[in-house]
């Protein structure tokens, strides 16, 4: 192989790696946003004092675990 061919192959590998990385990152953004929204909702319940009310604590034990 000549130097031009090796350089071209190297550029092709770098380009392919960049494209794969970029598309997989964009695909995961939806999952990250959903997880962030759920965490925000749980934090809002905790901040509003849900864990101090027994009825609310029964419905959201995963938020109020160990709190009395």
Curated annotation (Swiss-Prot):
Keywords: Acetylcholine receptor inhibiting toxin, Amidation, Disulfide bond, Ion channel impairing toxin, Neurotoxin, Postsynaptic neurotoxin, Secreted, Signal, Toxin. It is found in: Secreted. The keyword Magnesium does not apply. Disulfide bonds join 50-56, 51-64. Residues 22-48 form a propeptide. Expressed by the venom duct. Alpha-conotoxins act on postsynaptic membranes, they bind to the nicotinic acetylcholine receptors (nAChR) and thus inhibit them. Belongs to the conotoxin A superfamily. This is Alpha-conotoxin-like Mr1.3.
